[in-house]
Amino acid sequence: MLTRRAALLSPLAFAAARTVSFAQGGMTLAMHQNTSSGAGYRGSLEGWARAGIRHVELNAGLVDQFLETDTMAAARRVLTDNGLTPVSGSVGVGGLWEPNPDHAAALETLRRRCEMFAELGLEKVYGSTGANGTFSETDYDAAVDNVRQAGEVASEFDLQMMVEFIRNSAFISTLTTTLRLTRSAGNVQPMLDFSHLLTGLSQLGDLDLIRPGEIAHVHFQDVPDLPRELLTGQTRAIPGTGIAPLTHVLRTLRDKGYAGPLSVELFLYQDDDPYELAREIRESAEAVMMEAGVLR
C-alpha cells in the first residue's frame, strides 16, 4: 500500500528525483531561504542556482506566498529545473513544544505544512522553539508528549521531524534541553544552529554529549567580534568572516557522525541580490569547510 507521501509524489516520481544521500561522508553547503527571503521563493532559488548552490532549505511562508498565484507543480519545477535538492524545510509553526492551550491547533497547522513539504520532495522538516512566558519543571515532562505528537504528525508524510532550539527561548534554549526532550520522545531528532549554540546558554563542551548520528541537520553561521550582549539574529555573520570556532565545531560534528548539509541561515542580507550573496557565501563558507576537512 502506498503511504500518503508516496501517493503525493508518485505522479512525477518526485521523491526519486529529489532523493539525496550523504552516506558517503563529508558535508555540503546549503542555503536557507530565510537568507534571501526578500527575493521570494522563485527569486532566491534561481539566484542561488546561478551561483552554483545545489542544496536548499525551504521556508513555508515563501512557499505559501508562491502558491497564492501559482501551483505546486510549478513550485516543484523551480527546484528541478534549477538542479536543486531541498534538504529541509522550516514549518514556521509556533506552540508545538511548550504546554499551551493552542497546541492542538498548532498540530493541525503542522499537518498542513508537512503535506506541502512532502509534495515538494522533502525528507526532513523542523520547528523552532521560540516561546515566551514562565515555565516549571513539570512543563518539561508534559513537553515530551508534545514533541512525540509532532513527530507522529510528520511521520504521516514520511518526514523526519526536528527541533531547533532558539537561544532566547523561555522554554527550550539549549542543546542539553533539546537532547533530553528528543531522547525521551524517541521519534524527533535534534538539529543544531551554530548561532544559537555559540551565542546563548549552551557551551562548546555540550557537543560532547551528542551521540553518533544524533544530529539530523545543521544551520551554519559565524559570530562577529561584538560584546555578547549585542548579538542578535541580525548580527549573524557569513561563515569565515567572524571569530567563532567554526573548524572545531565542524570537526566535532564530523567525529559525531554528521555527514549532511550545512545550511547558511542569515537575516541581515535578506534584500541583497541572491546570486551575488550566494557567491560570497559560497567562497567564504566552503573555505572554512575545506580547512576543517569536511567539504565533500
Feature map (PLM): residue ranges:
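Short, contiguous strand/loop micro-motifs
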Residues: 31-32, 61-63, 99-101, 136-138, ...
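Hydrophobic faces of well-ordered beta-strands that scaffold small-molecule active sites
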Residues: 27-33, 56-58, 86-91, 125-127, ...
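Active-site-proximal loop/turn and secondary-structure-junction residues that shape catalytic pockets
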Residues: 35-37, 60-62, 92-95, 131-133, ...
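Glycine-rich, proline-tolerant flexible connector loops at the mouths of alpha/beta enzymes
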Residues: 58-76, 132-135
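Active-site acidic/histidine proton-transfer and metal-coordination neighborhood
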Residues: 12, 16-17, 41-46, 81, ...
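N-terminal substrate-binding region of glycoside hydrolase catalytic domains
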Residues: 51-67, 90-94
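Acidic (Asp/Glu)-rich catalytic clusters
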Residues: 45-50, 67-88, 111-121, 148-156, ...
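Histidine-acidic metal/acid-base catalytic patches
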Residues: 2, 7-12, 22-29, 38-51, ...
